[in-house]
């Protein structure tokens, strides 16, 4: 099965050929609905915007300027060198996602990440890893 164009995939612990858009949207909603996802309203809008833009095949359009004007309501003459709102909020969003996946999302089927250096999210299937302490000889 070929993967959908325009959707970046991150593979952990195995080969993933395709994650469905619907599965990713369900994971997005699961995160947004969770009381364990400690993000502000702005960070939630940011997260939802970048995921939906990526799923719509517009990952290449996700830039600091686009996020500043579409999510944070900055004017068309926005300058990220003098207004670091996007990078600051991206870092806070990354920390909120990390906390979510350490607590409520540790068993979620899909991990959504926003790697440092980009605002384009990646998606991967989480695979349970069996600990040696749970393996017994019979």
PLM features: residue spans?
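A detector for short, charged/polar N-terminal pre-domain segments
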Residues: 16-20
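Short, Lys/Arg-enriched N-terminal segment that forms or immediately precedes the first helix
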Residues: 24-35
